[in-house]
Amino acid sequence: MRRFDAVIAGAGAAGMFCAVQLGWRGKSVAVIEHSGCQGRKLMITGKGRCNVTNNCTADTVMKNIPRNSKFMYSALSRFAPEDVMSFFECLGVELKTERGNRVFPVSDNAKDIVKALVKACEDSGVQFIDCLLYTSPSPRD
């Protein structure tokens, strides 16, 4: 049985982003997805256009979070909206900013975001595992 440095539950935006980051750092990664479709929920964000982020500072994002904005501070201080945009542009996705500073792929198609994430995962050696094939984790010896 193959062992991985990391096993991620869910091939959504966060799961695939995390998998790519780990893969780029030379870690062996498996992503377990129960629906058999990577990025399924991403396909419907922004009415199928995928609102990637907002083109503003992390401080502006924090000011617009109605409750418990301190919860987001740690994440935003490490990976701000401009980092999100750079990440997707690095993957070859052209982005545009629309009214309200909302950022979308130039194609206006969420599929391009999903394809870029899946390709980045595959290129960095991430293995996708269908949940139906997965039985249970085993503790390390």
Predicted region positions:
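N-terminal Rossmann-like FAD-binding beta1-loop-alpha1 element of flavoenzymes
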Residues: A6-A30
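Glycine-rich FAD pyrophosphate-binding loop
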Residues: W24-L42
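Glycine-rich active-site loop/strand segments that organize a redox cofactor
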Residues: R49-L95
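Short beta-strand to alpha-helix junction loop
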Residues: Y73-F79, N101-V118
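Conserved small/polar residues in nucleotide/adenosyl-binding loops
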Residues: Y134-D141
